[in-house]
């Protein structure tokens, strides 16, 4: 019996728990690494000249859409965007994109990984 118990403990110790991706401002859970899509990382410059290092996720349940969608100055051809904000503190985290499908482009410096 002792041997079986030992094996059970060894099995449990091998289980890796996935870390959540958090809002850097309030630590609200935004998404998880398993929702990352490829290509995952991009650097873009907006028309005002600001650069953003963006991480793409198929979903970000902790981020809400804010504002009207527009395809103006979209970084992804065929996609319209709206702002993505933290559901808890309303901090701007990036953008939601809608086109053939929907995904979130989140600003790396506004996340805690």
Residue ranges and their predicted role:
Residues 1-113:
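A short Gly-Trp-Pro
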């Amino acid at each position: 019996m002792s041997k079986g118990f030992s094996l059970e403990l060894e099995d449990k110790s091998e289980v890796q728990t996935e870390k959540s991706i958090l809002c850097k401002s309030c630590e609200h859970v935004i998404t998880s690494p398993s929702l990352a899509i490829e290509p995952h990382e991009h650097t873009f410059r907006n028309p005002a000249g600001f650069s953003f290092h963006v991480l793409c996720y198929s979903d970000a349940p902790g981020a809400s859409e804010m504002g009207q969608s527009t395809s103006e100055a979209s970084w992804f051809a065929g996609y319209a965007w709206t702002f993505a904000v933290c559901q808890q503190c309303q901090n701007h985290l990036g953008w939601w994109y809608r086109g053939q499908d929907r995904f979130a482009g989140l600003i790396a410096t506004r996340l805690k990984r």
